[in-house]
C-alpha cells in the first residue's frame, strides 16, 4: 500500500478533503517513496566514497569523478523537487499543499544551505580552474556526509513499521553506525599519514617504510585494523600515534568511542530486557501463585489447575488482548467482536433464527477465554453469572451424587453451550462444567444477555423456543440416565420440570410469559359510542379493564362483559382497530355489534 492509513490526506474538522494543486507532489505516493529509497542507496555510496576519496587521492580516476558528478546531480534534482513537495504542518497535523507556503518554508530552512553546499563539487571545480589539487577543498567534500540524516530518518520509520522486526532493525542500525565510525577514522588516519611531511614519523610509516608506494587496499587494511583495535580498546601496540596530530585525533576518537560504546551497550541491554519482560512477568506470577497455594494448603490438583490456567493465560496473551481492545473506540471494538464471535453465536442452538438486531449488541460485549484440560469452568451450585459458547475443544457436564462422587452427564463439543440452564432460569448452576482438552470459549454475562433480549420481543420468543426444544431433548437423555433425572427432580426440579409444562406447539406463548413484562395497559370499553356529555348512548359509563395480549382475547372479554359477540372494535374517532399493538394506555374502545 502506498501510504499507511494514518498518513492519508486529513482535512480540518468540518472542511472538505484537501486536493493537490498542479505541480504539487504528495509525499505519501508510491513513486515519491521509491525516489527517496533510491536516494538512500546513493547516500550509502557517499558515506563510503567521500572519506575514501579524501584519504586515497592517488586512487582518483575519471570513472570515479563521473560517478560523483552523477550522484551530485541526483541530489540536486531532489533539492529542486522538494520545492513542490507538500508537507505536514506540525501545529495542526494537516497537509499543506499551497506552493507558495511550501517554497517559503523550504527557503527558510537552515539545512537548505548545507544541502546545496554538499551538492557542489568544490574540489573538482578548483582543480579545473587552478589545475592542481588542494587539501582544504578535499575536506570540504566531507560536507556530503550531511546526507546521512536521510539514513537516520529511514531507521526511525523502520522502527515504527510493524512489518519489520524492531530487534533486528535496531541491531542493523548499531552495526551501521559502528562500521561507519571505523571507516571514517581509518580514512582520517590515512589522510594524516599521506599529508605529513616526514612519512617515517607517522603511525604507518614507522612500521612500513615506503607505504605511500604500496597498494591502496594494503594501506586501507592497515588503517581499518588500527581503527578497530582503538575502537575496541584492545590496543596491541604494534601501531601507535607517532606525531602530535595523530595523538590529538586519537584522543578525540577514543572520547567518541566512549560515547559510542555506552550507546551500543545501552541499546542492546534495552533490547534484551524488552524481549525477556514477559518471561519475567510470568515467572513472578507463577512464583506468587505457588506461594499462595502452599500458604493456604490448597490440594495439589487445585494448585496444578491454577498453574496450568496461569501459563495458558500468558501463552494466549489474554490480558494483553483485553488491554489492547479496551483502548480502541467502541465502534472498532464492536467490529472486531463481530468478526471474531458472530459465527459462534449464529451456529449455537440458542440463537439460531434470531435477527441481527439481537446478534449485534449481544456480540459486542462478549469475551474470549481459554481453559487448559481438566479445568473447572463452572462449579455446581455457584451463582449463574455467565454462560459460555464452546468455540473449540470439548467439555464434560458433571453432577455430584449423594456419596460425593462425580458422574458424567454428557459431553459438549464445538457450537454447544454451557451454563445456559442456570442463566435462563436464574437459578444456581445445576451442573459442573469441566474442560476435557484445551478449550476456547466465548463468555456471555447474565446481565448483558437479559438486557439484550428484553427489548427484542420477537427474537426473545425465538431464543426461548430454542431453549424449550433443548430442554425437551434433555428429557429424552435424562430417561436413559436415572441418576440425572433424580438429581434434577430432587435439587432443581424446575430445570426439566419446566420442560414438561412447555409444549413445543405452545412455546411462543410460554416464551411471552418468560419474557420480562412491560407495564399493563388500562383501557375503557363501551357497548355504545359516547354522546356529547362523555357518556354512552345507553347511559353506561363503560368498564375499565386491563388490555389483553391479542385481539381474540379482547373480543372474548367484550362478550363476557356485555353478553354478546362483537363484530369489530372502534376508536373514539370511529376508526376500526386491526392490531392490538396500536391501542394505547387510557384509550376508549367501542364495540360494533
Curated annotation (Swiss-Prot):
Cited Gene3D superfamilies: 1.10.287.70, Jelly Rolls (2.60.120.10)
Entry's free-text remark on domains: The segment S4 is probably the voltage-sensor and is characterized by a series of positively charged amino acids. The pore-forming region H5 is enclosed by the transmembrane segments S5 and S6 in the Shaker-type (1P/6TM) and contains the GYGD signature motif which seems to be involved in potassium selectivity.
Pfam families linked to this entry: cNMP_binding, Ion_trans, KHA
Compartment(s) of residence: Membrane
Stretches that traverse the bilayer: 34-54, 65-85, 107-129, 139-159, 174-194, 248-268
Binding residue positions for a nucleoside 3',5'-cyclic phosphate: 350-470
Start and end residues of each KHA domain: 522-593
Main function: Probable inward-rectifying potassium channel. Assuming opened or closed conformations in response to the voltage difference across the membrane, the channel is activated by hyperpolarization.
Cellular component terms (Gene Ontology): monoatomic ion channel complex
Taxonomic lineage of the native organism: Eukaryota, Viridiplantae, Streptophyta, Embryophyta, Tracheophyta
Residue intervals on the Extracellular side: 55-64, 130-138, 195-221, 242-247
This protein's UniProt keywords: Ion channel, Ion transport, Membrane, Potassium, Potassium channel, Potassium transport, Transmembrane, Transmembrane helix, Transport, Voltage-gated channel
Signal peptide extent: none
Protein name, as recorded: Potassium channel KAT6
Record family assignment: Belongs to the potassium channel family. Plant (TC 1.A.1.4) subfamily.
UniProt GO molecular function: voltage-gated potassium channel activity
Amino acid at each position: 500500500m502506498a501510504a499507511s492509513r494514518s498518513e492519508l490526506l486529513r482535512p480540518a474538522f468540518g472542511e472538505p478533503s484537501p486536493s493537490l494543486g498542479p505541480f504539487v507532489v504528495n509525499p505519501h505516493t508510491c513513486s515519491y517513496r521509491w525516489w527517496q529509497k533510491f536516494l538512500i542507496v546513493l547516500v550509502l555510496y557517499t558515506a563510503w566514497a567521500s572519506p575514501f576519496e579524501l584519504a586515497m587521492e592517488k586512487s582518483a580516476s575519471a570513472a570515479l569523478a563521473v560517478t560523483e558528478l552523477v550522484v551530485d546531480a541526483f541530489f540536486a534534482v531532489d533539492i529542486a523537487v522538494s520545492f513542490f513537495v507538500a508537507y505536514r504542518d506540525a501545529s495542526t497535523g494537516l497537509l499543506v499543499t499551497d506552493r507558495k507556503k511550501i517554497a517559503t518554508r523550504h527557503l527558510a530552512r537552515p539545512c537548505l544551505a548545507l544541502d546545496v553546499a554538499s551538492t557542489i563539487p568544490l574540489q573538482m571545480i578548483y582543480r579545473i580552474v587552478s589545475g592542481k589539487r588542494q587539501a582544504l577543498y578535499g575536506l570540504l567534500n566531507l560536507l556530503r556526509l550531511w546526507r546521512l540524516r536521510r539514513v537516520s530518518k529511514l531507521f526511525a520509520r523502520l522502527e515504527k513499521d510493524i512489518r519489520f522486526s524492531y530487534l533486528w532493525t535496531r541491531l542493523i542500525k548499531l552495526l551501521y553506525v559502528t562500521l561507519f565510525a571505523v571507516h571514517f577514522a581509518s580514512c582520517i588516519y590515512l589522510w594524516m599519514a599521506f599529508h605529513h611531511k616526514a612519512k617515517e614519523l607517522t603511525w604507518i610509516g614507522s612500521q612500513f617504510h615506503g607505504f605511500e608506494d604500496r597498494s591502496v587496499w594494503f594501506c586501507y587494511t592497515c588503517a581499518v585494523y588500527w581503527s578497530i583495535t582503538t575502537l575496541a580498546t584492545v590496543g596491541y601496540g604494534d601501531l601507535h600515534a607517532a606525531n602530535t596530530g595523530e595523538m590529538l585525533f586519537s584522543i578525540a576518537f577514543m572520547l567518541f568511542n566512549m560515547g559510542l560504546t555506552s550507546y551500543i551497550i545501552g541499546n542492546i541491554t534495552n533490547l534484551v530486557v524488552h524481549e525477556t519482560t514477559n518471561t519475567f512477568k510470568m515467572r513472578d506470577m507463577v512464583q506468587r501463585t505457588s506461594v499462595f497455594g502452599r500458604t493456604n494448603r490448597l490440594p495439589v490438583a487445585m494448585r496444578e489447575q491454577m498453574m496450568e490456567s496461569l501459563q495458558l493465560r500468558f501463552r494466549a496473551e489474554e490480558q494483553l488482548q483485553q488491554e489492547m481492545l479496551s483502548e480502541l473506540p467502541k465502534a472498532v471494538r464492536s467490529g472486531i467482536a463481530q468478526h471474531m464471535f458472530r459465527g459462534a453465536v449464529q451456529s449455537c442452538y440458542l440463537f439460531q433464527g434470531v435477527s441481527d438486531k439481537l446478534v449485534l449488541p449481544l456480540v459486542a460485549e462478549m469475551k474470549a477465554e481459554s481453559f487448559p484440560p481438566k479445568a473447572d469452568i463452572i462449579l455446581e451450585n455457584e451463582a449463574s453469572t455467565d454462560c459460555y459458547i464452546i468455540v473449540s475443544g470439548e467439555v464434560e457436564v458433571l453432577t455430584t451424587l449423594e456419596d460425593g462422587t462425580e458422574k458424567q452427564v454428557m459431553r459438549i463439543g464445538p457450537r454447544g453451550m454451557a451454563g445456559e440452564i442456570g442463566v435462563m432460569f436464574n437459578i444456581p448452576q445445576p451442573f459442573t462444567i469441566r474442560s476435557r482438552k484445551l478449550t476456547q470459549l466465548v463468555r456471555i454475562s447474565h446481565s448483558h444477555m437479559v438486557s439484550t433480549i428484553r427489548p427484542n420481543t420477537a427474537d426473545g420468543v425465538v431464543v426461548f423456543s430454542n431453549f424449550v426444544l433443548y430442554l425437551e431433548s434433555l428429557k429424552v437423555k435424562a430417561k436413559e440416565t436415572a441418576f440425572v433425572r433424580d438429581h434434577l427432580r430432587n435439587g432443581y426440579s424446575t430445570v426439566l420440570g419446566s420442560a414438561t409444562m412447555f409444549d413445543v406447539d405452545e412455546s411462543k406463548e410460554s416464551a411471552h410469559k418468560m419474557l420480562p413484562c412491560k407495564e399493563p395497559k388500562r383501557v375503557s370499553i363501551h357497548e355504545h359510542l359516547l354522546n356529547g356529555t362523555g357518556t354512552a348512548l345507553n347511559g353506561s359509563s363503560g368498564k375499565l379493564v386491563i388490555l389483553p395480549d391479542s385481539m381474540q382475547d379482547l373480543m372474548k372479554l367484550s362478550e363476557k362483559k356485555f353478553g354478546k359477540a362483537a363484530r369489530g372494535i372502534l376508536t373514539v374517532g370511529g376508526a376500526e382497530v386491526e392490531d392490538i399493538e396500536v391501542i394505547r394506555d387510557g384509550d376508549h374502545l367501542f364495540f360494533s355489534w
